[in-house]
């Protein structure tokens, strides 16, 4: 149970009381976890008495685990009960003891006051792209291209051929690897150098000065040998082609493909309308944003960047030093701050919209979305809450409110009422888990074929740099 102690301007203090029964339940959960994880000589796993385990890990450790578990659950719950959303907070917990209620106080700063401009008369003009017969035929043509086969050709290279080349070293030794290049997708300098050549020819490809990633490349020459020339063979658009993509017939392929294109077009239209409304809200709102809010968002974005680099085997200090050498560090930091402020403005506008429209997500809905999110990430709810932390759980709850408010506003502008709101939390939970709705398996197969072709082409061009 949360109780507001004081609220002056955007400064707030409140107290949360946790009943003794829930404290005991948290103790039981912690003891169960310790009994499972702590190995005590002379006892089978899970059979050691609590006193023995306590002597092994320390009473203070047990209490800290219980306290953290209670804070993880009841801090965010207290914020929801009081309708608070804090920029920053200091939590002061009392000692925790089995069989006794637990209390903690929170002092923090609420989000700034936001006033939205008039949006209810907005005419959202963004429309879903029209799926015409021409669009369908072009998509079928693309599928045909992606599923093309290649046959060895004993003739000079033509514009649509696949050409296997071998990079040569000094003295024309076969120093580099061999790889295919799809001429109709190749860079102009590669295409022009190879057209008209035949298998066995040695070709000098002049690569113009360019930037690849973070590296500047001066103009240079790559010497290659044409290993093999293959001509493209396109299948006819008939039932046999449809069957190769796991469709019953060409008619079925056309029908399903049109439905998929229309679904994607509708999704694109929805996204365009959302962005149009959000842009209008941000442009018309009045707000003074605390620098701490921008700084916190910037820190979060920086952490994401560092995590991405780490996954690629690059340390942030190395990347920072490289940008410094290139004279790009100041620009990077300025862009990061600007993007952080843009995201904060967007979130504040959507949160105020949800407040103005009295959009709500009840406890049952929120718990269900947490369960969906946990399952999507292969964990239980408690593990998810521990991973997200107090602020993460609250941020997730606020993201659901933002989504619900946006859906309600869009429905109001389109005259559709609130019919789409019920699905909001579940859909948002799935997106937050990083799992988008899957495409039909048959269409996905064709897309995978395309991806393999593009990857091979990309690899070929990169090795020619």
Swiss-Prot record:
Enzyme Commission code: 5.2.1.8
Keywords assigned by UniProt, alphabetized: Cell cycle, Cell division, Chaperone, Cytoplasm, Isomerase, RNA-binding, Rotamase, rRNA-binding
A GO CC annotation given for this chain: cytoplasm
Domain spans labelled PPIase FKBP-type: 160-235
InterPro entries: PPIase_dom_sf (IPR046357), Trig_fac (IPR005215), Trigger_fac_C (IPR008880), Trigger_fac_C_sf (IPR037041), Trigger_fac_ribosome-bd_bac (IPR008881), Trigger_fac_ribosome-bd_sf (IPR036611), Trigger_fact/SurA_dom_sf (IPR027304)
Listed NCBIfam families: tig (TIGR00115)
Function according to Swiss-Prot or TrEMBL: Involved in protein export. Acts as a chaperone by maintaining the newly synthesized protein in an open conformation. Functions as a peptidyl-prolyl cis-trans isomerase. Probably changes conformation upon binding to the ribosome (maybe in particular due to interaction with L24), exposing a hydrophobic crevice that is probably important for its chaperone activity.
Family: Belongs to the FKBP-type PPIase family. Tig subfamily.
Name used for this protein in its record: Trigger factor
Natural source organism: Deinococcus radiodurans (strain ATCC 13939 / DSM 20539 / JCM 16871 / CCUG 27074 / LMG 4051 / NBRC 15346 / NCIMB 9279 / VKM B-1422 / R1)
């Amino acid at each position: 149970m949360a109780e507001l102690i004081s609220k002056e301007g955007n400064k707030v203090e409140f107290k949360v009381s946790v009943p003794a029964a829930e404290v005991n339940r948290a103790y039981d959960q912690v003891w169960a976890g310790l009994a499972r994880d702590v190995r005590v000589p002379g006892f089978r796993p899970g059979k050691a008495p609590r006193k023995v385990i306590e002597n092994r890990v320390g009473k203070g450790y047990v209490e800290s685990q219980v306290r953290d578990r209670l804070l993880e659950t009841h801090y965010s719950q207290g914020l929801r009960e009081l309708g608070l959303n804090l920029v920053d907070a200091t939590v002061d917990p009392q000692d925790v003891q089995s069989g006794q209620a637990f209390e903690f106080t929170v002092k923090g700063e609420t989000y700034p006051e936001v006033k939205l401009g008039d949006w209810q008369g907005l005419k959202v003009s963004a429309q879903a792209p029209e799926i015409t017969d021409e669009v369908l035929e072009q998509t079928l043509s693309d599928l045909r291209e992606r599923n093309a086969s290649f046959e060895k050709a004993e003739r000079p290279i033509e514009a649509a051929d696949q050409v296997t080349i071998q990079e040569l070293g000094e003295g024309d030794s076969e120093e580099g690897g061999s790889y295919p290049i799809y001429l109709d997708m190749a860079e102009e300098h590669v295409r022009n150098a190879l057209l008209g050549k035949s298998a066995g020819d040695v070709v000098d490809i002049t690569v113009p000065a360019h930037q690849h990633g973070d590296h500047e490349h001066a103009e240079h020459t790559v010497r290659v040998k044409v290993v093999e020339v293959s001509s493209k063979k396109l299948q006819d658009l008939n039932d046999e082609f449809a069957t190769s993509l796991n469709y019953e017939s060409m008619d079925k392929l056309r029908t399903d493909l049109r439905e998929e294109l229309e679904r994607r077009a509708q999704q694109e239209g929805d996204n365009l309308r959302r962005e149009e409304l959000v842009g209008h809200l941000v442009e018309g709102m009045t707000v003074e944003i605390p620098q701490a809010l921008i700084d916190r968002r910037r820190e979060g974005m920086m952490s994401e960047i560092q995590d991405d680099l780490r996954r690629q085997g690059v340390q942030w200090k190395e990347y920072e030093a490289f940008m410094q050498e290139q004279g790009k560090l100041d620009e990077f930091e300025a862009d990061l701050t600007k993007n952080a402020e843009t995201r904060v403005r967007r979130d504040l506008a959507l949160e105020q919209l949800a407040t103005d429209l009295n959009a709500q997500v009840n406890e049952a809905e929120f718990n269900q979305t947490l369960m969906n999110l946990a399952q999507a990430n292969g964990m239980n709810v408690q593990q998810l809450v521990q991973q997200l932390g107090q602020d993460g759980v609250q941020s997730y709850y606020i993201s659901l409110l933002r989504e619900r408010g946006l859906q309600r506003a869009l429905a109001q502008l389109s005259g559709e009422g609130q019919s789409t709101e019920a699905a909001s939390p579940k859909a948002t939970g799935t997106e937050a888990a990083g799992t988008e709705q899957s495409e039909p398996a048959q269409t996905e197969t064709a897309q995978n074929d395309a991806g393999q072709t593009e990857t091979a082409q990309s690899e070929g061009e990169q090795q020619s740099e």
